[in-house]
């Protein structure tokens, strides 16, 4: 199928049906690279491109023709952001209407694309008149961010629209970072170490995992720098029992095993069987010791469904969240999240914290983390939890480049070119 037609279908499913772009792309294997570029770019700039399309259309398209609307946005994205010959963009985008079985739209698409080419500067200036168009985010989210981060809101929105870096975590149980950097250099892959993390490497340009030396042999794992702090903040010691709640796909589970291979037990829990299998696949590829690893399919908040009664020395709760700290990696979040979602995430996190606190040993640590930048999912959750529990105290969390808050540390998107992430370390008093 024409890549522009496929893109229009996928973008339309995100906009109309609130489908995850990651899930849609995983089911579509043909022309993956270009389709991914077109989908990500169109969704990244959706709220800007949408204003242009609405201005140029004499009347709104019918709901059943929203795929054509998305196709037009895809054309605008290519014309403004990609280095593809103009005639190729116009011909391919117009031709996609035929494949979508809507040949009547070919003339309309051709007209709008050519108007965009002729009036581009004027149209882009027009989008700057509204804050949604200027920053390419939904209004409700901009308002939330301005309220939460009055000194940082603009830099957050700008970072959300940037292309994210590709960051690796070197598997130090197999190879040193210095030697792996040499291997990358031999493959002409430009990279630099991130000095604030022992195993992190950032590539100058993203590449396919198949180009990474030793990837299949487990020499590295793809993980943003913001998430690589978790295993160190846990203060792991030999012979401890550790729980990784909400563990899939295993980024932090595997890192825990790399940082300390001599744990007594590591229990990784997730409620999705397919995602749980990915934990096992990732740890197998990395060649990590698994004799003390237990992967359990369960709702971690329902303690009686999975617990043997054993208490844990360390618990990592990387809680399900709005993922508003990783919009640059998942631009569909701008369309998938709604204002009412945030209070639901808040309550779910409190439920998880309360449940997991009961299986933490006295003298143990629970690390709470999210990839959100919204206080309702972060500081306000910890504040409410502390107000209802006596034998708990905050432990210092030192994260390079993070903002120290009353109840934890917040990394904002773009700081040191990291994703947005929140950490709060809780100590259970004896």
Swiss-Prot record:
It is found in: Cytoplasm. The gene is rsmB. NCBIfam families: PRK10901.1, rsmB. The active site is at 371 (nucleophile). Gene3D superfamilies: Helix hairpin bin, NusB-like, Sun protein, domain 3, Vaccinia Virus protein VP39. It comes from Coxiella burnetii (strain RSA 493 / Nine Mile phase I). Specifically methylates the cytosine at position 967 (m5C967) of 16S rRNA. It holds the Pfam family NusB. Its EC number is 2.1.1.176. One of its GO terms (molecular function) is rRNA (cytosine-C5-)-methyltransferase activity. Belongs to the class I-like SAM-binding methyltransferase superfamily. RsmB/NOP family. One of its GO terms (biological process) is rRNA base methylation. GO terms for cellular component: cytosol. S-adenosyl-L-methionine binds at residues 246-252, 270, 299, 318. It catalyses: cytidine(967) in 16S rRNA + S-adenosyl-L-methionine = 5-methylcytidine(967) in 16S rRNA + S-adenosyl-L-homocysteine + H(+). InterPro entries: MeTrfase_RsmB-F_NOP2_cat, MeTrfase_RsmB-F_NOP2_dom, NusB-like_sf, NusB_RsmB_TIM44, RCMT, rRNA_ssu_MeTfrase_B, RsmB-like_ferredoxin, RsmB-like_N. This is Probable ribosomal RNA small subunit methyltransferase B. Its main location: cytoplasm. CDD domains: AdoMet_MTases (cd02440), Methyltransferase_Sun (cd00620).
């Amino acid at each position: 199928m024409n890549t522009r037609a496929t893109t229009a279908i996928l973008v339309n499913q995100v906009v109309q049906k609130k489908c995850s772009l990651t899930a849609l792309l995983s089911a579509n294997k043909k022309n993956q690279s270009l389709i991914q570029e077109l989908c990500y770019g169109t969704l990244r700039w959706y709220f800007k491109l949408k204003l242009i399309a609405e201005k140029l259309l004499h009347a709104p398209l019918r709901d059943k023709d929203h795929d054509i609307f998305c196709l037009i946005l895809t054309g605008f994205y290519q014309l403004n952001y990609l280095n593809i010959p103009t005639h190729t963009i116009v011909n391919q985008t117009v031709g996609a209407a035929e494949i979508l079985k809507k040949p009547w739209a070919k003339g309309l698409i051709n007209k709008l694309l050519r108007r965009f080419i002729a009036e581009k500067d004027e149209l882009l200036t027009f989008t700057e008149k509204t804050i949604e168009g200027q920053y390419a985010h939904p209004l409700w989210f901009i308002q939330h961010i301005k309220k939460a981060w009055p000194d940082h809101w603009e830099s957050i929105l700008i970072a959300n629209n940037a292309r994210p870096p590709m960051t690796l975590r070197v598997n130090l149980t197999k190879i040193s970072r210095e030697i792996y950097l040499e291997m990358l250099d031999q493959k002409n892959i430009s990279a630099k170490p991130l000095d604030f993390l022992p195993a992190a490497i950032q590539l100058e340009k993203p590449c396919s995992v198949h180009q990474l030396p030793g990837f299949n042999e487990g020499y590295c794992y793809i993980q943003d720098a913001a998430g690589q702090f978790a295993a160190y903040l846990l203060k792991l010691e030999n012979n401890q029992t550790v729980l990784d709640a909400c563990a899939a796909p295993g980024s932090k589970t595997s890192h825990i095993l790399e940082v300390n291979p001599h744990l007594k037990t590591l229990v990784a829990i997730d409620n999705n069987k397919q995602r749980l299998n990915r934990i096992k696949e990732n740890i197998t590829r990395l060649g990590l010791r698994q004799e003390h690893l237990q992967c359990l399919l369960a709702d971690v908040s329902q303690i009686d469904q999975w617990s043997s009664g054993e208490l844990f020395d360390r618990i990592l709760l990387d809680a399900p969240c709005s993922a508003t700290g990783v919009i640059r990696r998942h631009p569909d979040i701008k369309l998938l999240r709604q204002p009412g979602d945030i209070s639901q995430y808040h309550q779910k996190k409190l439920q998880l914290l309360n449940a997991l606190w009961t299986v933490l040993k006295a003298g143990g640590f629970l690390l709470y983390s999210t990839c959100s930048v919204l206080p309702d999912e972060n500081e306000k959750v910890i504040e409410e939890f502390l107000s209802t529990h006596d034998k708990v105290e905050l432990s210092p969390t030192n994260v390079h480049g993070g903002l120290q808050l009353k109840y934890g540390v917040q990394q904002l998107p773009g700081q040191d070119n990291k994703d947005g992430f929140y950490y709060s370390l809780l100590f259970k008093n004896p």
